[in-house]
Amino acid sequence: AARGSELPVGEAARVIEGAGQWLLPGLLDIHTHLDLEVDLEPGLPEVVRHGTTTVLVGNCSLGTCFGRQQSGAQNPIVDCFTRVENIPKSVLNQCVEAVHWDNTGDYLDHFDNIPLGPNVGAFIPHSMLRVEVMGLTDSISRAPTEAELARMEQLLEQGIAQGYQGMSTDGLP
């Protein structure tokens, strides 16, 4: 593969007549749940095989950008993904072992060190943002304090500055 100034120049070896046809240089999948899979099989061959060249992770308020977020017996990645994705906890526990970062910057940086198939963009997931600031139990049982809201705003602004595409929610009240 080549990029930018490395692209070859000159006459094409083959010209395809495209009149009346569609040209899709690559598809963008804005709603994936590949957050765990991208670290276990970063080439994401089933995605690329279908013509998708860019995926977004961190959808539906779930993701791994804050790291494992484990505290005592609480395991937010396993608990949250089990409910939404219906993935067995035994499988999710193995996925959590692949998480080696503990902040949003290191999460984005780790993509530079794995052999990605498609391009990957990320959202800050709202549920995991709440867990990061409030802990799992409090994040699902009470409203945040003003100080907690301010910390969430700070982390979200930091994430946007780092290159996150925005914040995802699950759409529930």
Roles of regions detected by a PLM:
Residues 26-35:
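Metallo-beta-lactamase
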Residues 17, 29, 57:
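Redox-cofactor binding/interface segments in oxidoreductases and associated redox assembly factors
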Residues 40-165:
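Divalent-metal coordination cores built from histidine and acidic residues
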Residues 4, 36-38, 56:
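Activation segment
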Residues 164-172:
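Short acidic, glycine-rich surface-loop motifs adjacent to enzyme active sites
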